Regions:
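Residues lining hydrophobic/aromatic ligand-binding pockets adjacent to catalytic sites
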Residues: 1-265
């Protein structure tokens, strides 16, 4: 399983991350599955790496994290991207989140912890996202562990291998929707395999450029997870699918686990 980092990731991100664990947890409740996070790609703007989508009184609303632009940012490794705290984005983000979810059933229960992460001044986008992702893994009680990749995997240059191989194929078309995409400058030739053992799965387990705000995906449909849950503004806009994971947690609380992993019911 290979994913890109994301800021308050959408449900499709968490559905993909929990897929392998969901297949094993019923028979092995103590199981923990590794989910690999691409740590050696370059920064790509207009992606979930620094934005999330929530449901507000005015419809869908994007919350973005501004980053420091030093030199050629699009040839900067994702782990080196610094958050721009000179912009008052934290205040605006908290205001937007509170406005959207103050009446949801579990907002008050989780609000302080979520806002504490935003207020902590974490210097890099990578570290900020990791803190957020691990918070939701813990609160939803998912048996997954985030493991940063040790080297970059080039999407175009890895072929198919049999299921169960020590190196599973990571194969996806060149992400043309992200014009700034390029192999990191420190990668000379070819792609190196991820460490660890995988099982063959949807999209050959490479979701890095499948989950994108400007590109629809069928992950929730493929996993039979495109189903409604309570949303504050559903009466006005209808159910809105694949929003930030905070939408699920603030509205469903402890039931979020059963939504993402229905095999536990």
């Amino acid at each position: 399983m290979l994913l890109s980092t994301a800021f308050f990731p959408p449900l499709s991100w968490f559905a993909a991350a929990a897929e392998d664990w969901g297949r094993t947890v019923a028979s092995n409740p103590s199981s923990v599955c590794d989910v690999y996070l691409e740590a050696h790609e370059n920064y790509c703007k207009q992606s979930y790496r620094n934005r999330c989508i929530i449901a507000s009184a005015n419809g869908l609303e994007a919350i973005s994290v501004p980053v420091v632009h030093d030199g050629d940012i699009f040839h900067t490794p994702i782990t080196d991207i610094r958050v721009d705290y000179e912009d008052p984005w934290v205040k605006k983000a908290k205001r937007a989140i509170e406005s959207a979810y103050s009446t949801s059933a579990y907002f008050e229960y989780y609000k302080d912890d979520v806002f504490a992460i935003l207020d902590s001044g974490i210097p890099t986008l990578w570290e900020l996202n990791l803190a957020i992702i691990n918070f939701f893994i813990k609160k939803i009680r998912l048996g997954i562990r985030i493991v940063p990749t040790t080297t970059f995997v080039i999407p175009d240059q890895i072929g198919n291998l049999p299921s169960g191989s020590t190196f599973d194929p990571v194969r996806f078309a060149h992400p043309s929707h992200c014009k700034q995409w390029a192999p990191p400058v420190h990668i000379a030739t070819g792609g190196m395999p991820l460490e660890g053992s995988f099982q063959q799965g949807r999209y050959d387990k490479d979701y890095r450029n499948v989950i994108h705000p400007k590109k629809e995906n069928t992950i929730l449909e493929d996993m039979n997870l495109k189903k409604p849950y309570f949303q504050v503004f559903a009466g006005k806009y209808g159910f809105q699918s694949d929003l930030s994971v905070m939408d699920l947690l603030f509205n469903e609380g402890p039931q979020s686990l059963l939504y993402l992993v229905p095999s536990l019911v």
